[in-house]
């Protein structure tokens, strides 16, 4: 009788998934047409002639708001599994989750008092 280990399909899938990028990348680079010229260095704006430079500077405040969003989003994602298992985990998990929520809140209040949210 032929017995298959529990994880053989996983290892086979992992092997095939890890072989796809190194095989597909050279195939696409050799088969794709390569056009050289000054048009390659211009920005594409839906067939319309580009106006101005493609490289513009963003204010640093944009990155501050974006980083606050990413941190709060990561915090929400990390709290979701805890919320799903709230009844089974008990008081120690509640204490850890409250500490995990308190740290970004304290950091946000500190940044707000220092004026990090002011757009000036």
Swiss-Prot record:
The chain crosses the membrane at residues 9-29, 64-84, 89-109. GO terms for molecular function: NADH dehydrogenase (ubiquinone) activity; quinone binding. Its main location: plastid. It catalyses: a plastoquinone + NADH + (n+1) H(+)(in) = a plastoquinol + NAD(+) + n H(+)(out); a plastoquinone + NADPH + (n+1) H(+)(in) = a plastoquinol + NADP(+) + n H(+)(out). The keyword Hydrolase does not apply. It is found in: Plastid, Chloroplast thylakoid membrane. Its EC number is 7.1.1.-. InterPro entries: NAD(P)H_OxRDtase_bac/plastid, NADH_UbQ/plastoQ_OxRdtase_su3, NDAH_ubi_oxred_su3_sf. It is an enzyme of class 7 (translocase). GO terms for biological process: photosynthesis, light reaction. Keywords: Chloroplast, Membrane, NAD, NADP, Plastid, Plastoquinone, Quinone, Thylakoid, Translocase, Transmembrane, Transmembrane helix, Transport. One of its GO terms (cellular component) is chloroplast thylakoid membrane. It is a multi-pass membrane protein. It comes from the Eukaryota. NDH shuttles electrons from NAD(P)H:plastoquinone, via FMN and iron-sulfur (Fe-S) centers, to quinones in the photosynthetic chain and possibly in a chloroplast respiratory chain. The immediate electron acceptor for the enzyme in this species is believed to be plastoquinone. Couples the redox reaction to proton translocation, and thus conserves the redox energy in a proton gradient. Belongs to the complex I subunit 3 family. PANTHER family: NADH-UBIQUINONE OXIDOREDUCTASE CHAIN 3. NDH is composed of at least 16 different subunits, 5 of which are encoded in the nucleus. This is NAD(P)H-quinone oxidoreductase subunit 3, chloroplastic. It comes from Huperzia lucidula. The gene is ndhC.
């Amino acid at each position: 009788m032929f017995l298959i280990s529990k994880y053989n399909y996983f290892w086979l899938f992992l092997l095939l998934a890890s072989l796809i990028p190194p095989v597909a990348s050279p195939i696409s680079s050799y088969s794709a047409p390569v056009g050289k010229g000054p048009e390659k260095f211009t920005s594409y704006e839906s067939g319309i002639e580009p106006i101005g430079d493609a490289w513009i500077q963003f204010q640093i405040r944009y990155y501050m708001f974006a980083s606050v969003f990413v941190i709060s989003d990561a915090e929400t994602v990390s709290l979701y599994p805890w919320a799903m298992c709230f009844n089974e985990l008990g008081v120690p998990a509640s204490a850890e989750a409250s500490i995990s929520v308190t740290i970004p809140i304290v950091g946000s209040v500190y940044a707000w008092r220092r004026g990090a949210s002011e757009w000036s």
